[in-house]
A protein has these predicted regions:
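PLP-dependent aminotransferase class I/II
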Residues: 67, 213-297
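Short acidic capping loops at alpha-helix termini that bridge into adjacent secondary structure
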Residues: 82-86, 106-109, 186, 193, ...
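PLP-dependent enzyme catalytic core of the Aspartate aminotransferase-like
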Residues: 317, 321-325, 330, 334-366
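Conserved PLP-binding catalytic core of the aspartate aminotransferase-like
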Residues: 279, 291-325, 341, 345
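N-terminal "arm"/small-domain region of PLP-dependent enzymes with the aminotransferase-like
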Residues: 1-62, 153-154
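Phosphate-binding glycine-rich loop
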Residues: 64, 69-109, 127
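Active-site pre-lysine segment of PLP-dependent enzymes
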Residues: 141-154, 166-226
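PLP-dependent aminotransferase-like
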Residues: 102-160
Length: 366
């Protein structure tokens, strides 16, 4: 006799959205020289956050505050909202899972872009949703195509990231606001803003929590350098934010992450420094791409997506050549986006390793 999995879970493949660098290092038997594939901040958290987390480590015998009271209050003050409009969770990925669970049942339709952030799709599949995708247009998620699919399919959810991962592209605030205004009230817009701190100031529409069908997601993993702490938050109309309490794991955000995020949020100087260093790293990555005859795409994130000039098979050979030389990078998973590789912002030393490895990877790719 075997355990009886649910009818939703039984047919799912035993895969994960991302193969981590640690898994690749174990397979290779050697550590990477440059870790430039996960869009982490190699510049690290605020020293004040590190100090706060170090002090909090001695108190980890206590459970976290399940209401995330202090962090929600600080975020509310930072954003000009009420703490009742904020949901804190163990990273955006978990919040996506809660969102799918909250709004969809097996067989319900969800709309996204083909090649967009795969973890959202992972949750849709895990809860039995029916995913309908539309193509990118000129390497950007296309609001018009998404909206057309919404009107045709009447989905429970529609996913849109601004800025976008994996392409680094973005839309100005007025275009995003137009999408918000056009989505019917019985469809929830899942607006992923994980990279918003890196984007031009006119990228994010104003925070309006009056619409119950718009949920915005932000994180401490990227600009704040706390990816390993697993902490992020959602911004929503009050009744929707409260609904998350029905299903979320109330002790899921660890105590050390809560304290670290609170200290990180308060250190504006460190955030400004990180944004400057990321902008400089993007320029360096772009220059390296140009020097090798490749095309760096415009980016409003902490990575640069580089068009390799041919098809996905060629880009995969370039990727493999970089990995063979100890440079961890990634690439989009579907055509035509997979003609590219994606390189995260790194230190000067990291990017020097990348610059040294790229010519050989291109030569070996043929």
């Amino acid at each position: 006799m075997q355990p009886r999995y649910t009818s939703v879970v039984a047919p799912l493949p035993s895969t994960v959205p991302f193969v981590g660098p640690e898994t690749q290092e174990r397979a290779r038997g050697v550590a990477f020289k440059a870790r430039l594939g996960a869009n982490e901040s190699v510049f690290g958290p605020s020293p004040k956050a590190i100090a706060a987390m170090r002090q909090a480590a001695a108190e980890c015998w206590m459970y976290c505050d399940p209401e995330n009271y202090d962090l929600k209050a600080a975020l509310a003050q930072e954003l000009g909202l009420s703490s009742t409009n904020i949901v804190v969770g163990e990273g955006i990925d978990a919040l996506f899972g809660y969102t799918v669970r909250l709004f969809t049942e097996p067989g319900d339709t969800v709309v996204s872009s083909l090649g967009a952030y795969p973890t959202f799709n992972f949750h849709v599949a895990g809860y039995g949703g029916r995913l309908v995708t539309v193509p990118y247009v000129s390497d950007r998620e296309d609001p018009a195509s998404l909206l057309a699919a919404v009107r045709r399919e009447r989905p429970k959810l529609v996913f849109f990231a601004n800025p976008d991962n994996p392409m680094g592209s973005w839309w100005p605030a007025d275009a995003v606001q137009a999408l918000i205004d056009a989505v019917p009230m019985d469809t929830v817009l899942v607006l992923d803003e994980a990279y918003i701190e890196f984007a031009p100031p006119e990228t994010a529409p104003r925070l309006d929590v009056s619409r119950p069908n718009v949920v915005r997601y932000r994180t401490f993993s990227k600009a704040y350098g706390m990816a390993g702490a697993r902490i992020g938050y959602a911004i929503a109309e009050e009744s929707v934010a409260k609904a998350f309490d029905k299903i979320r794991n109330h002790f899921s955000v660890n105590r050390i992450a809560q304290v670290g995020a609170l200290a990180a949020l308060a250190d504006r100087a460190h955030l400004a420094s990180v944004l400057e260093r990321v902008a400089s790293a993007r320029e360096t990555i772009g220059a390296t791409a140009h020097a090798n005859g490749l095309v760096p795409l415009p980016s409003a994130t902490n990575f640069v997506t580089i068009a390799c000039g041919r098809d996905g098979a060629y880009a995969k050979r370039v990727l493999d050549g970089l990995i063979a030389q100890g440079v961890f990078v990634r690439m989009p998973g579907v055509a035509p986006l997979n003609r590219c590789i994606r390189v995260s912002a790194g230190t000067a030393a990291d990017l020097a390793v990348f610059a040294e490895a790229l010519p050989r990877a291109l030569a070996d790719a043929g």
